[in-house]
Amino acid sequence: MSLKILVPIKRVVDYAVKIRVKGDKSGVETANVKMSMNPFDEIAVEEAIRIKEKNLAKEIIAVSMGPKTSQETIRTAIAMGADKGIHVETTAELQPLSVAKLLKELVDKEKPNLIILGKQAIDDDCNQTAQMLAGLLNWPQATFASKVDIKDDSVHVTREIDGGLETLSMKLPAIISCDLRLNEPRYAKLQNIMKSKKAELKVETPESLNVDTNCNLKIISVEEPPKRSGGVKVESVENVVEALKKHALI
């Protein structure tokens, strides 16, 4: 079976950047900050490419939503090995349900039979889009995938659970969300990076997809975690035991 794979990706603050909270606590500073593809989505792109390299897929479509700068993230996916990209251009703050609704409309247009995406984005950690999209499409889903095997018209997904591993089998079409242990994403070759800059991207909008992106959730406050106090050196095991007793920990 030759698959058509849709891979949703998100542009986020780079994982190596030290996050700074805005003065009004409405969010984090993103101006003049290095941005990159969500790490979980990189894994999704890599897995789609590996499936294609096994001659199990004919096309990989990378999709991203957000302002025009999101096109850079799509081009990164193309440089890695995706075949084409779709940009849903919007400046609105998209919540998981809105993202899922937009993806559903794209699925109806593009007709993929496998969707692979990161289990969550590192900026909001919602971990909701895959599940919501599966509900809207009425497709089977396997979340937190650490191994993916495709046989005929079925997908076998191994996922880590408390105390062991769980393997699920699904009929296509299906949705998979990726965990960090699934694979290690490749670096794009320079020649592919240069080619991706000239790649033509298909542009949609929430309006062209007939999706209302009004927010039903409101962020009340974003705060930095409290700073950790320094540790105390102890001279012996007896002193450790005494300190634990003092704080009623034993």
UniProtKB/Swiss-Prot annotation:
Its cofactor is FAD; AMP. Pfam families: ETF (PF01012). GO terms for cellular component: mitochondrial matrix; mitochondrion. One of its GO terms (molecular function) is electron transfer activity. It is found in: Mitochondrion matrix. Binds 1 FAD per dimer. SMART domains: ETF. GO terms for biological process: fatty acid beta-oxidation using acyl-CoA dehydrogenase. Keywords: Electron transport, FAD, Flavoprotein, Mitochondrion, Transport. InterPro entries: ET-Flavoprotein_bsu_CS (IPR000049), ETF_a/b_N (IPR014730), ETF_b (IPR012255), ETF_beta_N (IPR033948), Rossmann-like_a/b/a_fold (IPR014729). Belongs to the ETF beta-subunit/FixA family. The electron transfer flavoprotein serves as a specific electron acceptor for several dehydrogenases, including five acyl-CoA dehydrogenases, glutaryl-CoA and sarcosine dehydrogenase. It transfers the electrons to the main mitochondrial respiratory chain via ETF-ubiquinone oxidoreductase (ETF dehydrogenase). This is Electron transfer flavoprotein subunit beta. It comes from Dictyostelium discoideum (Social amoeba). The lineage of its organism: Eukaryota, Amoebozoa, Evosea, Eumycetozoa, Dictyostelia.
